[in-house]
């Protein structure tokens, strides 16, 4: 992609399905230029407590949930100290001023004990921790688990993956709560 390229953007909701806790849907965004797909992003959302209109209940094999292995925190390579204003600061930049990120009262109304960090803030910060070694073009994945309560501290580990066909020169990253050992997020960065 170059400055001045005409971009074609397609967004869709796909794969509406029952989940044991509600309903899941994939929101897909694709960006093309000159007929070539240059970006594809898939975000999966869960609407807790909702059911499909058909009343369909998920069968165990339909849940799309892979049992997670017990998390054993690795040796941290970074530590983030996030202040209580992190959500407000990121919201001012991103435009996402959701009350769960900006107001303790708003966060409590949605079931959180205090404000939480934006998921994309933590994901982008982990990507930045990988640094320039990721290259200019890369595939990036992120899986969110437990929200980061603000103020809070996140332990982070960036690990280079073995050079193989699946992850040539890539990286994995994980962020967790150093006190509870609960994982906040994890993912991969693979240069193209």
Please report, for each region that a protein language model flagged, where it lies by residue:
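A short linear-motif detector with a strong N-terminal bias
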Residues: 6-10, 22-24, 58-61, 94-95, ...
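Residue-level signal for the start and early helices of compact helical domains
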Residues: 22, 34-37, 71-73, 81-84, ...
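HotDog/MaoC-like acyl-thioester-processing domains
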Residues: 1-79, 148-150, 157-192
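Catalytic strand-loop segment that frames the active site of acyl-thioester-processing enzymes
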Residues: 45-117, 131
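Catalytic-pocket segment enriched in acidic/His residues
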Residues: 100-101, 105-162, 169, 175-176, ...
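Active-site-proximal helix/loop capping residues that flank conserved catalytic or ligand/cofactor
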Residues: 41, 88-89, 124
């Amino acid at each position: 992609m170059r400055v001045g390229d005409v971009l074609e953007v397609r967004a869709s909701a796909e794969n509406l399905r029952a989940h044991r806790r509600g309903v899941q849907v994939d929101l897909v965004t694709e960006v093309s230029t000159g007929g070539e797909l240059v970006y594809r992003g898939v975000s999966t959302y869960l609407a807790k407590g909702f059911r499909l209109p058909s009343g369909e209940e998920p069968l165990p094999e339909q849940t799309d949930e892979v049992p997670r292995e017990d998390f054993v925190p690795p040796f941290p390579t970074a530590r983030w100290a996030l202040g209580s204003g992190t959500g407000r600061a990121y919201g001012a930049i991103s435009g996402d001023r959701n009350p769960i990120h900006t107001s303790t009262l708003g966060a409590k109304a949605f079931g959180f004990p205090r404000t939480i960090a934006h998921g994309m803030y933590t994901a982008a910060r982990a990507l930045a921790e990988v640094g320039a070694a990721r290259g200019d073009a890369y595939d990036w994945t992120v899986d969110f688990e437990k929200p980061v309560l603000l103020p809070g501290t996140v332990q982070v580990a960036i690990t280079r993956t073995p050079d193989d066909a699946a992850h040539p020169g890539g990286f994995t990253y994980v962020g967790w709560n150093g006190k509870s050992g609960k994982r906040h997020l994890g993912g991969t960065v693979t240069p193209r």
